[in-house]
UniProtKB/Swiss-Prot annotation:
It is an enzyme of class 3 (hydrolase). One of its GO terms (cellular component) is cytoplasm. It holds the Pfam family UDG. The gene is ung. Belongs to the uracil-DNA glycosylase (UDG) superfamily. UNG family. Coiled coil: none annotated. This is Uracil-DNA glycosylase. Excises uracil residues from the DNA which can arise as a result of misincorporation of dUMP residues by DNA polymerase or due to deamination of cytosine. SUPFAM superfamilies: Uracil-DNA glycosylase-like. Its EC number is 3.2.2.27. GO terms for biological process: base-excision repair, AP site formation via deaminated base removal. The active site is at 65 (proton acceptor). It is found in: Cytoplasm. HAMAP family: UDG (MF_00148).
């Protein structure tokens, strides 16, 4: 199983793939992919780990579970494939980016450019049934992604954890705030964005922290034209 990960996540997660809960999770997923329409495609489940290496991670943006509509999810929280209209939460993220850092809003919602710079866009649950949000809650993914958060917390180099909404903020209990920077606000969803997400300036605050630690800032501006990688 560890051959799925071809970067420095492989050794740090090797033991996790052998644990009984993960063996059970893998069997559940095998059955689900054979009998249901599951997102993302099984080859994209670990995109967040493939694109953002363990030692290169600078920022973690936690999501909940993948988009459950056709063609949307590709393994990064909040991101959608090229050619897919940005969903409402991402539209609000773009609005905050524009007001925070002068972001030029693209037509797409493909966030690979961030992931490659060290922004880990991690959902706490990595798969979902088509049209059924939270359908893979409690099958084992939370244990796996909690382990990822613990491993990142254990790193010497400080990180920024961006926690939007109560679900993500539950993970703050794992994070050493003496070392890492936690930015917590309401979720960018249209239901909550006006309660404190807008105006929270998470992107400039992230770069201020990285700069203060002598780390490379994130270029939040996305390319205007993208192709799926």
């Amino acid at each position: 199983m560890t051959t799925i990960l071809q970067n420095d996540w492989a050794p740090v997660l090797a033991d996790e793939f052998e644990k009984p809960y993960y063996v059970k999770l893998r069997q559940t997923l095998k059955e689900e992919y054979q009998t249901q329409t599951i997102y993302p495609d099984m080859f994209h489940i670990f995109t967040a780990l493939h694109l953002t290496e363990y030692q290169n991670a600078k920022v973690v943006i936690l999501g909940q579970d993948p988009y459950h509509g056709p063609g949307q999810a590709h393994g990064l929280s909040f991101s959608v494939k090229p050619g897919i209209k940005p969903p409402p939460s991402l539209v609000n993220i773009y609005k905050e980016l524009k007001s925070d850092v002068g972001f030029e809003i693209p037509q797409h919602g493909y966030l690979n450019h961030w992931a490659k710079q060290g922004v880990m866009m991690l959902n706490t649950v990595l798969t979902v049934r088509r049209g059924t949000p939270n359908s893979h809650k409690d099958i084992g993914w939370e244990t796996f992604t909690d382990r990822i958060i613990h491993l990142l917390n254990d790193r010497e180099t400080p990180l920024v954890f961006i926690l939007w909404g109560k679900h993500a903020q539950e993970k703050a209990a794992f994070i050493d705030r003496n070392k890492h920077f936690v930015i917590a606000s309401p979720h960018p969803s249209p239901f909550s964005a006006n309660r404190g997400f807008f105006g929270s300036r998470p992107f400039s605050r992230t770069n201020e922290f990285l700069r203060s630690r002598g780390l490379q800032e994130i270029d939040w501006q996305l390319p205007m034209q993208v192709e799926e990688e």
